[in-house]
Structures are given as C-alpha cells and as structure tokens.
Amino acid sequence: MQGRSRKLACSMLAGAFCVTSLAEGSAQSLSTYGTPGLVEMPTARVLKDGDLAFTASAFGPNYRYSATFQVLPRLYGTFRYSQIKNITTNAFLDGDTFDRSFDVHYQIWDETDLRPAFAVGMRDFLGTGILSSEYFVATKSFGSKLEVTGGLGWGRLAGRNSFSNPFSILSDRFDTRSSGFSGTGGQLETG
C-alpha cells in the first residue's frame, strides 16, 4: 500500500509541474509530424529561436519520431523517422516501411493586428515521398483563446486531380505526383 501511495504522490507532483509550466506561457502545439500545428495540419507559427523539440506520435498502427529545430527566427527544419504499417503499393515497399524524411518551413511574415502570419513549407522532400507535400498557410489569433488557420496544400495534404501546384515553376515533377513512392529515401525529392 505504501508503494502505491508513493507512486500516486509522485504522479500528482509531476502533473502539477507540467500544469505550472504550461500556465507560465502559451505552449506551442505540435502536430503528429512534430511541427507547429494541429493533428496533421501545419500552422504559420514557428517555435522560439533556437528551440529544439523531440516528439513521438502514434496514429493507428503507424509511428512517427521527429526532431524539429528552429534554425533562424523564421525558419525551422524537421528530421523524421516513421514506421508505416502494411503498405501494399509495390513489391519493394510491401509490408512495414521505415521512412526517413526532412521538412522545411519558412514564415514569410509575422501576424499583426490586421494581418495573419503567413508561411510556406515542404514535407518529406528528402525521403521516399510517402509523406511528401507542399503548402501555403496563414494563421490568425482572435483574442487569447481562438486561433484560425487556413491554407492550401498539395501532395499528401490534398486530393488527386485538383488544380496545379505553384511549385511546378521550380520543377515539372510537382505537376504530376506518382501514385507510388520514389526510391528508398535519402535522395532529394521535389515532387
């Protein structure tokens, strides 16, 4: 019984420290990709300069482990290692797949009283392309309790056969995204 009481007291103390640290300032929410966002959707927010965040997330049978680092005041990058279960796209990737990927996100401008924060980003452009996407996103706060995010995404963030990707001015590979995956990862992928 005494062991149980000690465990309960330690758990309550740890919980109190967590609540206290969250109350000191608004915590940045991180998505299942380990980047500022909500669930799967990125926001135009960035971390504080020099911040480093490690995350682990599970979504069904899939797992993602990420390290996000704020390189410059407006630029962050993310290294991610994912375990994706039961892929049956082609013979090479049948079954469980382990994917390494890299993301980059650049905040073009900060939020003001009248204008939302605005950012552009690319997910999984150094990897197999399983999670690849590109996006524009805007985020605006209304008071201290409401934040609205909207954007436009391609690749994994969009459906098929929608309008053309503006990143296609950089490479034709952004115009047509294959239904499978590209290679085994570790190479620069732009579409």
Predicted regions and their residues:
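Cleavable N-terminal export/targeting peptides
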Residues: 1-32
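Transmembrane beta-barrel domains of Gram-negative outer membranes and organellar outer membranes
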Residues: 25-133, 139-146, 150, 154-159, ...
